[in-house]
Amino acid sequence: MNGVINVYKPQNITSFDVVRIIKKISRIKKVGHTGTLDPMATGVLPICLGGSTKIVDFIMNEHKEYRAKLKLGLITDTYDREGKVLKEEDASKILEEEVVNCINSFKGEIIQIPPMYSAIKIKGERLYNLARKGIEVEREGRKINIYNIEVLKVNLPYVEFKVNCSKGTYIRSLCYDIGNKLGMGATMWELERTKTGNFSIENSINLEDINEENIQEFIIPAEKALSKYERIEIDEYFSRLLKNGVKVKDKRLLDKIKANDILRVYQEDKFIGLGQKTKEGFKIVKLLV
């Protein structure tokens, strides 16, 4: 059993709970998720099985799309509604136009400080473990990209918005930063991941609908999961070299390929893996046979 299942994660379970459930149903040891969703969050969580766990990082690096709701005037220690309330104030007098302009200003490349309640490690310890002990440490800002952000509804103190962003973006931190910029704080109230790369809600499967009898129906082959990468067909000679880890410098192959592009590599219609052209030649970066 190899491939990817586009699971819709329900509320109140962890991403690892989803992995554990799929492991039990599939009876496969190698199962991995492609990007943590907080327990309170719902949405798209692609799960890789068997040999396809090798492509976890490629899916994890894809752009993400979320639909979120924040509450203005509220600050919690976790930056979401499940945390301890640190501050609360009236947000009813702020102008809707001011809120919309503020949220729109986050579009582009920004530096984001991750929340204390996160799985990031500092000196070998998870931040959430330190936070639970009441310890707050300085976190280094990380460069992220907000490709698009759109306000969907304003019903103060609540604001709903849609965001398309890069890997590593914390929507809880984004909500906190929006509130901070407005001078009154904000907390994430709801979160749904609507897309991870090519995986969307429209083609996701509810976790509770997957069982031992039907799981095979929902498995997407690795090559289809990686369909964003262009395809290249190679002959048996180059295939043998690449499978053995050789960096091919032959111009007959190199002239067809742009530098640094990642490609799906096929030989006689059989998917071999992902390849990339570098200064040293063309090589397989992820062998999948």
UniProtKB/Swiss-Prot annotation:
The active site is at 38 (nucleophile). GO terms for biological process: mRNA pseudouridine synthesis; tRNA pseudouridine synthesis. Keywords: Isomerase, tRNA processing. The keyword Methyltransferase does not apply. SUPFAM superfamilies: Pseudouridine synthase (SSF55120). It catalyses: uridine(55) in tRNA = pseudouridine(55) in tRNA. CDD domains: PseudoU_synth_EcTruB. The keyword Isomerase applies. InterPro entries: PsdUridine_synth_cat_dom_sf, PsdUridine_synth_N, tRNA_psdUridine_synth_TruB, TruB_C. One of its GO terms (molecular function) is RNA binding. Its EC number is 5.4.99.25. It comes from the Bacteria. It is an enzyme of class 5 (isomerase). Signal peptide: none annotated. Belongs to the pseudouridine synthase TruB family. Type 1 subfamily. Responsible for synthesis of pseudouridine from uracil-55 in the psi GC loop of transfer RNAs. NCBIfam families: TruB. PANTHER family: PSEUDOURIDYLATE SYNTHASE TRUB1, TRNA-PSEUDOURIDINE SYNTHASE. This is tRNA pseudouridine synthase B. It comes from Clostridium tetani (strain Massachusetts / E88). The lineage of its organism: Bacteria, Bacillati, Bacillota, Clostridia, Eubacteriales. The gene is truB.
